[in-house]
Amino acid sequence: PLGGLKVEGCCVEPGYYSFVSEFEIPYIYGLTVGELAIMINEEGLNRGEKGYDPALKCKLSVIPMDGWRRKMSYIETGLPWVLPSPNIPYPQSAVNYPSSGITGEFNNYLNIGIGYTLPFETFAAEWIDAGALKKELDSYNLPGIAFRIIHYKPIAGSSKGKLLHGVQFYYTDYEAADITLTQFYVMQAVNR
């Protein structure tokens, strides 16, 4: 969904693998699923419980997509969207995920729109001063991303029915935005 030109973020360190960071590759890796499969297979990134296991290398065939170009977003492919997760209901959710998804793993630290109609688009909590948070984030002058104040009550999940305050983010220039770092700037701002 992010196209094939965006590559950014840290690589997971050995010993810190998880469901969302299984391989030593950047958080945003700029590859198609087929290219990723080839890289994992050819570079020996498959590993067993004790590390690299050459027996896990397989005979792999990848069929290239017709008409796809690296600069294309998912929407530009014209393909219908198929939900990879209930919390990623539309292509923009997948585009926003790298900007907030890590924050969502911190056990209810901040609500990122899950349980509401804006999954992966917000950073909010009951205790946040939304105006102060927006002002702090605006002072960082982050390229390609902007924030607006938001107040909402999730309709599902651990924050269901709670009035949350915070910011909704949106891209003003996706190519210029360092989307992976956004969530870390937000965490810095809420802890000031």
Task: Enumerate the language-model features and the residues they cover.
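Conserved functional hotspot residues or short segments at active or partner-binding sites
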Residues: 123-192
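Glycine-rich, aromatic-lined ligand/substrate-binding cores of catalytic
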Residues: 67-150, 154
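Catalytic-loop motifs flanking and including active-site residues across diverse enzymes
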Residues: 32, 118, 182
